[in-house]
């Protein structure tokens, strides 16, 4: 048997006295794709950060090739050929794509040629001279992967790499992963998507509560076994009565929808989209599908006031808000959950309690009790895993960070809730909770506009789906007509 590229033995780690890794063993072979699954807070990202030298273990040993280490640092990890592509791309927004890829990379005469080779291998059309701040999340992910490839990574860690990629981009990434396998690169593939895991990974490990509870060849396990290993208790995917009680929105909700739409958009044109019209009524969930670059996020950001439209008008409950500031639109009940929670959504070093109520701050003498009550409400309703409300958001897992952001949006008393990739980085067992949460919100006469790259999410959830292609609507599907094939056909500019 070939010597493994990587062996982690009895890795332990605590944060604030809470054990997040409990004696983890993990092995990666040359040319192997080893999938890593687990619920939010299971410890997947922490384990990978330890392997990449970003975090320091409390105990345990890492063996890379023939060398054993008690701990690594990022520079040493890079020297050893380890590269972590994080769940949230970490780019320098004011630098170009080329500068981001080559940052701190030793200069070589063949650097430009090597970079062009990598771009061709990825079949990547990204503009190297563009500013990183202009990139969609999918392109940011590609930049991170290119960083690793340019550093001759022998161990590549991909943390939810397809979370915001379209099917075409995902397949292109998979082709590159297979090419890397042929070069004996070992790949750790963290994902919640079982079809992708079965397509790529020969081996799988499942983590729960900081421990590896299942590990072996992927083909040896059924989907039900893998899901049950993550969530041992059978879950009813409908929200419990207790959860529904805790999710009752603040403020005065209308008991009956009005005879006019909550949102009305006429001939709206802006950066990335042209002449869009839209009406959403109270209690309706409208899906907005399309490929990355189709203009969905730009449209949502314009509705919220983050971008200035070139033409068109916007009404919220029959009051024109076209010229209102973002703050004014928020005060009127238009609430937006952004695509990238770490860059545009959360204050990572601030505590959970402050992040949750920041849209709806109480008077200072009420603040402590109010924040504690709000954190408790959403801790119960959404199952947010945290030690207490003073815990910095940065220390939470990606899925729990997303739940904090959702809690903030709900606490802002929305009339219209726009959610951009709401289940990005959220595990299999928690996705159903978010779907039911959106249904519960809509049942309280809130209008919901949902953007997602995972078109499967719209089936059975959206009342109707609008599909965008190159900045325009390519079609609209009623609830009974919503299928993955029809949405993808429209997304590529075809006729459903």
Curated annotation (Swiss-Prot):
Keywords: ATP-binding, Cell inner membrane, Cell membrane, Membrane, Nucleotide-binding, Repeat, Translocase, Transport. CDD domains: ABC_Carb_Monos_I (cd03216), ABC_Carb_Monos_II (cd03215). Residues 6-234, 255-495 form the ABC transporter domain. This is Autoinducer 2 import ATP-binding protein LsrA. It comes from the Bacteria. SMART domains: AAA (SM00382). The complex is composed of two ATP-binding proteins (LsrA), two transmembrane proteins (LsrC and LsrD) and a solute-binding protein (LsrB). It is an enzyme of class 7 (translocase). The keyword Membrane applies. It is a peripheral membrane protein. GO terms for cellular component: plasma membrane. It catalyses: ATP + H2O + (2R,4S)-2-methyl-2,3,3,4-tetrahydroxytetrahydrofuran-[AI-2-binding protein]Side 1 = ADP + phosphate + (2R,4S)-2-methyl-2,3,3,4-tetrahydroxytetrahydrofuranSide 2 + [AI-2-binding protein]Side 1. InterPro entries: AAA+_ATPase, ABC_carbohydrate_import_ATPase, ABC_transporter-like_ATP-bd, ABC_transporter-like_CS, P-loop_NTPase. ATP binds at residues 38-45. Belongs to the ABC transporter superfamily. AI-2 autoinducer porter (TC 3.A.1.2.8) family. Part of the ABC transporter complex LsrABCD involved in autoinducer 2 (AI-2) import. Responsible for energy coupling to the transport system. It is found in: Cell inner membrane. PROSITE patterns: ABC_TRANSPORTER_1, ABC_TRANSPORTER_2. Its EC number is 7.6.2.13. The keyword Repeat applies. GO terms for molecular function: ATP binding; ATP hydrolysis activity.
């Amino acid at each position: 048997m070939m010597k493994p590229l990587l062996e982690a033995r009895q890795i332990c780690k605590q944060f604030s006295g809470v054990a997040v890794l409990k004696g983890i063993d993990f092995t990666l072979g040359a040319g192997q794709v080893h999938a890593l699954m687990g619920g939010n807070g299971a410890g997947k990202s922490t384990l990978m950060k330890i392997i990449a030298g970003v975090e320091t273990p409390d105990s345990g040993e890492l063996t890379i090739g023939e060398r054993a280490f008690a701990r690594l640092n990022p520079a040493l990890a890079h020297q050893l050929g380890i590269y972590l592509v994080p769940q949230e791309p970490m780019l320098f927004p004011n630098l170009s794509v080329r500068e981001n890829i080559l940052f701190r990379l030793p200069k070589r005469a063949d650097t430009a040629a090597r970079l062009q080779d990598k771009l061709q291998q990825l079949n990547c059309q990204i503009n190297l001279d563009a500013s990183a701040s202009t990139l969609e999340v999918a392109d940011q992910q590609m930049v991170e992967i290119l960083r690793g490839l340019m550093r001759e990574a022998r161990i590549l860690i991909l943390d939810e790499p397809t979370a915001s990629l379209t099917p075409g981009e995902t397949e292109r990434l998979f082709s590159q992963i297979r090419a890397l396998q042929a070069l004996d690169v070992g790949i750790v593939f963290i994902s919640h998507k079982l079809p992708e895991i079965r397509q790529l990974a020969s081996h799988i490990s499942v983590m729960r509560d900081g421990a590896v509870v299942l590990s072996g060849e992927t083909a040896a396990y059924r989907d039900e076994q893998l899901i049950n290993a993550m969530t041992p208790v059978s879950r009813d995917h409908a929200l419990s009565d207790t959860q529904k009680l805790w999710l009752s929105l603040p403020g005065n909700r209308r008991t009956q929808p009005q005879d006019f739409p909550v949102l009305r958009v006429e001939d709206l044109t802006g950066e990335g989209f042209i002449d869009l019209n839209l009406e959403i009524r109270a209690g309706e969930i409208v899906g907005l599908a399309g490929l990355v670059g189709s203009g969905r996020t730009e449209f949502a950001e314009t509705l919220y006031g983050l971008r200035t439209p070139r033409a068109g008008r916007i009404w919220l409950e029959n009051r024109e808000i076209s010229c209102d500031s973002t703050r004014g639109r928020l005060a009127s009940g238009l609430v937006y959950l952004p695509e990238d929670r770490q860059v545009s959504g959360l204050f990572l070093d601030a505590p959970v309690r402050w992040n949750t109520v920041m849209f709806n701050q109480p008077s200072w003498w009420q603040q402590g009790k109010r924040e504690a009550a709000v954190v408790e409400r959403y801790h119960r309703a959404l199952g947010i895993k945290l030690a207490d409300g003073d815990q910095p958001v940065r220390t939470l897992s990606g899925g729990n960070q997303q739940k904090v952001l959702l809690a903030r949006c709900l606490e802002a008393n929305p009339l219209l809730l726009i959610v951009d990739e709401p289940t990005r980085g959220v595990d299999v067992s928690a996705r159903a909770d978010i779907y039911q949460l959106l249904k519960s919100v809509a049942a309280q006469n809130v209008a919901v506009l949902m953007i997602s790259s995972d078109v499967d999410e719209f089936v059975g959830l959206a009342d109707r789906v609008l599909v965008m292609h190159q900045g325009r609507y390519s079609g609209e599907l009623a609830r009974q007509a919503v299928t993955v094939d029809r949405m993808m056909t429209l997304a590529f500019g075809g006729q459903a």
